[in-house]
Amino acid sequence: MRGAWFLVVAIGVAAVGRPASAAEAPRPARLLVVSVTTGFRHASIGTAEPVLEELGRSTGLFHCDHLRMPPGRLPQPKPPKRAKDTSAEEWAKQEAEFKRAQEQFRRDDQAWQAGLKAEFAKVFSAESLRDFDGVIFLSTTGDLPVPDLAAFLDWIKSGKAFIGFHAATDTFKSSDAYCDMIGGHFAGHPWGAGGEHAFVVHEPGHRVAAMFPERFRWKDEIYQYDLRTKPENLRVLVSLDMQASQPKEPWHVPVAWVRDYGKGRVFSTNFGHNDTTWKEPMFQKHMAEGIAWALGRFDAPAAPNPEVQAAEYLRSVVAAAAAATKADADALRAKADAKIAKDAAWATGLRPMLLGIRGLKPEDRAAAYAEVIAEVEKP
């Protein structure tokens, strides 16, 4: 497998500051780092790969075997843009040429796709996976040619680590089983890469999130997730702080979480779109602790926290409702927090009503917002 044409191995070395005796330190874990994309490709992947390698070396925690995009793929033809002075006859010629170029690309791309499929069949075989302690999906997108997705998920359940960075949640969209494992699936990113967004840490003492201030701002692209997310499966550690962010949407946006998956462990973080994120020491510490936890190097709480998520969901709806109705956001938030503190199950009980708002267009939410505000203001 090491001679494969696009599986590249980067061996980690002992960390600075480790005990002098090698016998006292666990061996570095072997992680398969997958950065293949069949959908959108993030430019930050090229920044992230050497950062991960150096993180493995400096901590002595792991070394990386990279499964990368194979070389030699021809660029896809770009559709023509019609100029104002283009005649109908000339435009028809341009469209016809584009269609011919598309057909030629599809024919030429078959060999590349076959090579990609063959490499995945080799690397994701049961024999190959036995050599790894876990896998990192590094901003993967689309349907990867994993030969047996169910077998791969069972491999994680057997006691392996799965670490997902950023667009790992934009992978295998049609697979409910994969979505269940990773915790959610991409459903847009209203909070763009150029904006500085606000975040809240739900457990400041949790090692995977302890490096962040309890409330902080960060410049990165933030995903929202579709309705397949199951709060009863996840322990969310970091969420978008909707009241301090723009736009204000009436739903919870988890950002980093952990979960047990059979005997395996899953760590997923949405951070990682921007190059600058990967260079930040705080994010690198977040990565290192998340990877170490997923590998079982230390124990930390992973039991689901649906009540915490329900409370944050309600706060997000309150923030959106206050903005839409010009109500006093701070006063509403204070009342909601007081009720949550008195009865944590109260917000959970409102979840069905809150979920219904997500299916409404912004212009149709007024009645639903009024109902939520009335619930918050009840004595």
Task: Give residue ranges: language-model regions.
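Solvent-exposed loop/turn segments at secondary-structure junctions
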Residues: 37-40, 70-73, 140-144, 162, ...
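A glycine-rich, often tryptophan-bearing local segment used as a flexible ligand/cofactor-contacting loop or short
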Residues: 128, 137, 141-211
